[in-house]
Amino acid sequence: MGTPGEGLGRCSHALIRGVPESLASGEGAGAGLPALDLAKAQREHGVLGGKLRQRLGLQLLELPPEESLPLGPLLGDTAVIQGDTALITRPWSPARRPEVDGVRKALQDLGLRIVEMGDENATLDGTDVLFTGREFFVGLSKWTNHRGAEIVADTFRDFAVSTVPVSGASHLRGLCGMGGPRTVVAGSSEAAQKAVRAMAALTDHPYASLTLPDDAASDCLFLRPGLPGTTPFLLHRGGGDLPNSQEALQKLSDVTLVPVSCSELEKVGAGLSSLCLVLSTRPHC
């Protein structure tokens, strides 16, 4: 038997989707979203892909940009992946639901078992789902409802699944994330701290907690692409984006910190974990 939580972050592949020109205008990105600097957004996205491929050594698969899917680069909302199973989500926004099609095919081609939502009353954004290595927490938010959370529980029956209220327009992973198999990192806002308190009340597992000045800094990815026993990585927002949180992140001494920027993509709602899907095609990972 492995150590509880040891499966957290095991990965061999990463999936991203290119940034389309339609994201550069507020109209293309959707009602209420600001215009952004397309070239800067594409540079940020390119650097992220380079870090995943070169620094972490992952097999990188990049779906081409689609002008009809301005928010297509936020493909972390389109699937929840654990082990060899991928739950294809039903995003809250009807305009975003076609985004799942290309992701579904890519994950099928990688040999994952595909599970569909199959309920028109359910909504689920993937960035409302936090996997700790031991259990799932699903944020009940503007984007994800109870029925969506129930389908997560039905899909991943080997794990406990608990729901956490999320206020405002945030996703759960925009408030908290995993800094390691036993460490929850969370922002300092009342919404983030409320979510962490709710998680602590619901779990049977002890987690350490690290508070970061910026909520967005907690949207990080703990990744173990190497063999067991090798030092894991923490992909996180760097000092150019969130300088106030860098000192606190240094307290995570058991990981190699890999900073990236997504300050331009953040303008249209992108958090770091929304910009990629990571998975393992290796057995027993």
Swiss-Prot record:
Domain of life assignment: Eukaryota
One GO location term (cellular component): mitochondrion
Subcellular location: Cytoplasm; Mitochondrion
Molecular function GO labels: hydrolase activity
Transmembrane segments: none
Post-translational modification: Phosphorylated by TBK1. Phosphorylation inhibits the translocation into the mitochondrion upon Sendai viral infection.
Active site residues according to the UniProt entry: 171 (proton donor), 276 (nucleophile)
Keywords of this entry: Cytoplasm, Hydrolase, Mitochondrion
Principal subcellular localisation of the protein: cytoplasm
EC assignment: 3.-.-.-
Stated role: Putative hydrolase with unknown substrate. Does not hydrolyze N(G),N(G)-dimethyl-L-arginine (ADMA) which acts as an inhibitor of NOS. In endothelial cells, induces expression of vascular endothelial growth factor (VEGF) via phosphorylation of the transcription factor SP1 by PKA in a process that is independent of NO and NO synthase. Similarly, enhances pancreatic insulin secretion through SP1-mediated transcriptional up-regulation of secretagogin/SCGN, an insulin vesicle docking protein.
Entry's family note: Belongs to the DDAH family.
Name listed for the protein in its UniProt record: Putative hydrolase DDAH2
Naturally occurring in which organism (per UniProt): Rattus norvegicus (Rat)
